[in-house]
């Protein structure tokens, strides 16, 4: 992914290494410069070599790379939130055009294509005259299926698009996330996102009268919700529980 080059450049410059020092004997300075600019990729073996040249471990590098990737997405979400609450469809479409342009010039366009789909989902939520294409939903589902280690990005992506999927798929994906407790135990931000996702899955099951699956998400939410959780989420949870009781009586 091209942002890896940007992260490498941050490590190189902060360590006061020149392009020549970082490139070493296995790479030219022009090749390394293109990698830092996101204009080319490099083989894994060479990547490890240039990390050694600037004395950075792969663990430290990937940790910073994940944070860099999350920062990009958080920046986009900061633009999305005011558009969502003001029903600014034109603003969403402007962001979509920007994502499409980035995908055209990127060596790894999938990230920007997924962002476009996320924005389309938000547009559909605010204006029912727009619709989601099944091909786009399939692309997101295929991406999520292939990702073994979910980050904040995947949580936000699925958390904003779950309503377009059938209840069985939402239940399967939701369960997979819920059963990986180590993912959120030490990271409070992730824990809150997982809680919100559990509430979303719970609501989705209730709306489709899938009470057996709803019971799972109710029990899971009960387990992870605590006094540190904001009052809003707690109130939403109690509202859903009452709705569940009423719905079961009318079936």
Segments (PLM) and residue ranges:
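A short, Lys/Arg-rich alpha-helix, primarily the initiator
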Residues: 1-14
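"A position-specific structural signal for the A-helix of alpha-solenoid helical repeats
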Residues: 7, 78, 112-126, 156-160, ...
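Short alpha-helical DNA-recognition segment
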Residues: 15-33
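Short, charged recognition helix plus adjacent turn
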Residues: 63-91
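Alpha-solenoid helical repeat architecture
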Residues: 66-77, 107-115, 150-157, 188-196, ...
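Helix-turn-helix repeat elements of alpha-solenoid scaffolds
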Residues: 85-98, 129-138, 167-179, 208-219
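Amphipathic alpha-helical segments of tetratricopeptide repeats
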Residues: 97-104, 138-145, 178-185, 218-226
């Amino acid at each position: 992914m091209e942002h890896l080059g940007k992260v490498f450049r941050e490590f190189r410059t902060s360590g006061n290494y020149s392009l020549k020092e970082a490139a070493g004997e296995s790479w030219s300075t022009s090749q390394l410069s293109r990698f830092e600019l996101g204009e080319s990729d490099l083989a894994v073996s060479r990547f490890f070599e240039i990390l050694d040249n600037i004395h950075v471990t792969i663990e430290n590098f990937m940790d910073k790379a994940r944070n860099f990737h999350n920062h990009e997405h958080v920046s986009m979400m900061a633009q999305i939130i005011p558009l969502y609450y003001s029903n600014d469809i034109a603003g969403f479409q402007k962001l979509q055009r920007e994502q499409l342009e980035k995908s055209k010039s990127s060596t790894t366009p999938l990230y920007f294509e997924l962002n476009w789909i996320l924005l389309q989902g938000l547009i559909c939520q605010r204006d029912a005259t727009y619709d989601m294409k099944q091909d786009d939903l399939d692309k997101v589902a295929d991406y999520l299926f292939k990702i073994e280690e979910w980050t904040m990005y995947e949580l936000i992506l699925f958390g904003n698009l779950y309503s377009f999927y059938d209840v069985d798929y939402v239940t399967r994906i939701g369960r997979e996330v819920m059963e990986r407790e180590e993912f959120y135990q030490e990271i409070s931000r992730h824990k809150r996102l997982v809680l919100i996702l559990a509430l979303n899955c719970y609501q989705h099951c209730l709306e489709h009268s899938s009470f057996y699956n709803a019971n799972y998400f109710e029990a899971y939410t009960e387990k992870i919700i605590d006094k540190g959780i904001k009052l809003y989420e707690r109130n939403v949870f109690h509202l859903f529980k009452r709705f569940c009781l009423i719905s079961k009586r009318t079936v």
